[in-house]
């Protein structure tokens, strides 16, 4: 199964900020794999089955990986470097473009979607 990402710029990375976003995007009773970042501790007492992957001790324990997000960030950084800097007020739009490109990684799919968007805007 191909990893899909959802990106959003947040004012901080505290649990109180992250949990509502996670609840909005992830179905209850889903299995959620995270790294050991402290803000994810709240997931232990949430409606999700939460499992932590400690990169330094168990990179792929029981075949459960979180490297999909690492893969996304590698793609995003490579794409964003081409611009030699991005205005802060437009960063979220550039990030959303990276999300779209990652979630629709096949060029044929991207072209098809873009054609549909162009046709829709001409009507």
Swiss-Prot record:
It comes from Haemophilus influenzae (strain ATCC 51907 / DSM 11121 / KW20 / Rd). Pfam families: DDE_Tnp_IS1595. InterPro entries: IS1016-like_transposase, Tnp_ISXO2-like. Keywords: DNA recombination, Transposable element, Transposition. To insertion element IS1016 transposase. The keyword GTP-binding does not apply. One of its GO terms (biological process) is DNA recombination. This is Uncharacterized transposase-like protein HI_1328.1.
């Amino acid at each position: 199964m191909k990893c899909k990402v959802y990106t959003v710029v947040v004012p901080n990375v505290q649990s109180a900020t992250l949990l509502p976003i996670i609840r909005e995007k992830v179905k209850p009773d889903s299995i959620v794999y995270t790294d050991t970042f402290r803000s994810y501790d709240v997931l232990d007492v949430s409606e999700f089955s939460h499992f932590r992957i400690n990169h330094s001790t168990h990179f792929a324990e029981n075949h459960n990986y979180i490297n999909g997000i690492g893969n996304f960030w590698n793609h995003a950084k490579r794409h964003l470097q081409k611009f030699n800097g991005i205005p802060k007020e437009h960063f979220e739009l550039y990030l959303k473009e990276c999300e779209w490109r990652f979630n629709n990684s096949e060029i044929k799919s991207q072209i098809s979607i873009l054609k549909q968007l162009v046709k829709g805007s001409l009507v």
